[in-house]
Amino acid sequence: MNKSHAQKVIAIFMVIAMMFGALSVIPASAADSDSGADAAYADSTQVSEAHKEMFGTYNRTLAEIEDMINAISYHDYNLKYAEVPKAEQTVVIRAADYIPEETTAEVEVLHDYEGVPGPSLKMGPTGKTTWHVNIPKTGRYAMRITYIPYVGETVTTIERMLYIDGKLPFSEARYLYFPRSWEYVLNEDGSFDIDIVGNDIRPIRQQRPIWNTYFLRDWLGFTIDPFEFYFTEGDHTITFVGAREPIIISTIELYRYEPEMSYEEYVEYYKSKGAKIIETTEPIKVQAENPYLVSNACLYPTNDRTSALTEPQDPAVIKYNILNSSVVNQWMRYKVTVPESGFYTIAARFRQNSLIGMFTSRRIKINGEIPFREASFLRFKYSPDWQSKPLNDGYTDFMFYLEKGENIIEFEVVLGHMVDYVYRVGQLVRELNAAYQQFVMLTGPTPDAYRDYGFTRVIPGAVRTIGKAAEELYQIADELEAITGELGDQVATLNTHAMLFETMAEDEYEIAPNFVTFKNYIIATSNWLYASLDQPLKLDYFVIQGVNDPLPPGKANFFQAAWFEISAFFMSFTMDYTTIGYRYDAVDGKQIDYRGEVEMWIVSILGRDDALIQRYLIDNYFTPYSNIAVKIKVISAGLTEAILAGIGPDIANMNSTDTITWGLREAVEPLNDKEGFDDVITWFDDAAITPLTMENAKGEVLTYGLPTVMAFYMMFYRVDTLAELGLEIPRTWDDLYTILPVLQNKHMQIGLPTGLAGTNIFLYQLGGELYADGGRRINLGSNIALEAFQKLADMFRKYSCPVNYDISWFRTAQMPILIADAIGTYNTLMGFSELRGLWEMAPLLGFKQDDGSINITSPVTVTSVVIPRGATDPDATWEYMKWYTSEETQIRLAKEQLNVSPNPTTKYNTANINALLSLAWTEDEYKAVSTQLKYLVGIPEYPGSYIVPVHVNNAFLSVYNDGANPITAMQDRIIDIDKEISRKRKEFKMDYLEISYRDSYAVESKPEDNLAS
């Protein structure tokens, strides 16, 4: 949408004003009376005050919102000041010299910290810290920070925002990330631990806090060089605003940045100093899986069995023999000792079989310095096979000067020559999304293919955007084909998208018929962008060798490959690849006498990753302290059958429905009599325990499992879209009803759960319950339940909310408000880089109560850990369950889940409340999540409960598809639900109600009259 700057400012002012209750939302109907408007104003003010107490996270200033919406990109910022000369001298700011009266962060001045003399400043994870700086001369200054990470409870990436003179210089300054340093914990000889089977054990990655000097740059990799900031001569302020994690800073330097010398200049420079070329020497091989430092804990060694030449290799057991990296700005460092100074060739054995027809890029640093300009553009071309090549940029094989003795060689993941193309495609995606929104506002998401909308007359700018995108994509595809020398998948994808965009731009009557495909191609273009941001490379080893020495072999010959495959085939008959055994069963040759042993089966679609995390935690934090061994098996299916047959594992995970059903069948053990049970359940919200607890046929109220993961609903919204439309962020359903006409007028949608999930949200917020009479019958016939179902149905019938949608609707702003699973949706959205800063999460919408509070209750679903019938040692299993679900272990588990995720902000949906709140949330995220956690409800599981979602979903679909009356549609299914509940209760020998089709529970009755035993 094209708006003037004045229009945007007015829209932003309206948002701020409404946030503070200064304005009400404009009534949907112009016919509203003055008194109605006054009432709406008073009501809005009252709700706003209640929200301030409950939510309290949306107090942005007008300037902050304006910065967020209007901040230019660094690309445009750099062009704007391109003619400004570079800095002539360095300006150093001591971090300890902050301005106290302009600092809100928790700060502490440290002295001589970790070997750095003088003062340094520790800053908390949130709040702002401001410094004064005097600039001697107007110019462009790069900025580098000398810092050390603070080792605390959480270990996500350190994140800050940068403001200069109180303003955001460009949009990328909102996301500055400071990497940590990690090291592997290895045996004294540098080898990995092995388990009792002989497989390598993934090494522990422990944080190694060291001082770093880091130049500020784009964390997504859209720039190879550091940011350059424009400063005028005179006094200025620099402010860091904390988003995640504490940090300790020694100095902030503003300096003149100059690109490195060229490769030719580099060679000539060292030759002029007498450096010689090492023609031949004994090769120095460095195994990639053994770096001495890495930037992310998710950079861990993995196993490759695709080649007999990968080192080390074993046809029988798992050996970690490669390092696989892909995320921009990740790095790994290696120590290399050379016998003499001179120019060497660095050759790598690698495999890049992911980006077909393309190359991935790396930057090499030697002793902390980029040796020459081309060293930031190393290429590793596509091939399905392993390769062995000297480091090169696609044109030249490089030599590198190394000093005699120890050298540090660092490989960093960069976009290399793809930087310009990725940036251009990113800009196109943003422009195409804006054009798509304009089309949707005119036609809706599914325009009539035979209608003349007059696109070129009504929204000519959007049509021109499509044409421009086609031209740009064709040009990018041609340039990529030229530099790669082939028409790969990625180039072909761009050409395909360009063809459609070209067709639509040249003939406006092709827009409506191809509109759905147009949307899909925008998403596909965005996915192309993400694929390009990913720079996968499997590295086996690299060799420091003479420039004339032969390269190490890349691909195994026929006999090597055949022998390896034959050996692996015969070994497969004797090796157990499903068991991930404990680290040792003997110490100094003496068998360990464990006091208990637990066997656990993991059904994992993620392969061995989940099991390896469990193995690491158990071996380091459970077995050494409990003297209980845990055996882990990774299986693909068969858990249910094994447990029911009594031959399953000692511990298992299952959903709440199965937990109760199997508990009633005595297939899993109740936990109430276990030692410490009453204390353990206090670790969880009552809502998480309720679905795992039930009264059995003997009248005993028993809990059959402990919750491990928990899902609940929250609201996600597009800040930019609501601000641009001048709409306040809704807090109640009434707020939503008020803004829906505005959204619908723009053909925008709201995302809501359907069927039983959606019904339960309204039902429990209105004060109802799903079951009545202790689970003997369904409560959907009550007035509250029927009202809840009516409200859900109205959202889809009257307000046309879509039944089928996906996260891409939110991504394109076609759906600016989405109610969905909190943690899963959060993790997904954090992966969409183009949405950085454009969305937020908030507590669920709710109903205002008489006291002015808002009921934002969210139903909860849980997965539990249980003790199956036939467990060999239930007491040992219970000890493991207590340890596993404890706050300390769940925090460690969350860290390990983060360590295997390339997304530095990934969250783990633990059911342990304290552990969940201990994750590295931003201040606003923490307030939103902690607020929602106060309003959770667990829905009990009863015999026959499996049938409820089937009938409720059918009732919902009959209303949505066939136009049935919601009340009638629900009432028609109540008897069938009750009959199934009674049938299952009878099967379990529990009290039940005799149900007939003549019975009706729409009116008050005494269920005891129909009670049977």
Regions found by a protein language model. Give the residues of each.
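Extracytoplasmic
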Residues: 36-544, 549
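Conserved N-terminal structural module of periplasmic/extracytoplasmic solute-binding proteins
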Residues: 37, 41, 421-427, 432-661, ...
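Hinge/lid segment of periplasmic solute-binding proteins
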Residues: 574-596, 659-714, 737, 838-852
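Extracytoplasmic "Venus flytrap"/periplasmic binding protein-like
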Residues: 618-687, 720-728, 814-817, 830-834, ...
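Periplasmic solute-binding protein
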Residues: 663-666, 686-729, 734-737, 748, ...
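Glycine-centered hinge/linker elements that transmit conformational signals in sensory
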Residues: 775-803
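Extracytoplasmic/periplasmic substrate-binding proteins
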Residues: 794-879
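Long, aromatic- and glycine/proline-rich binding clefts that accommodate carbohydrate-like moieties
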Residues: 844, 895-958, 990-1012
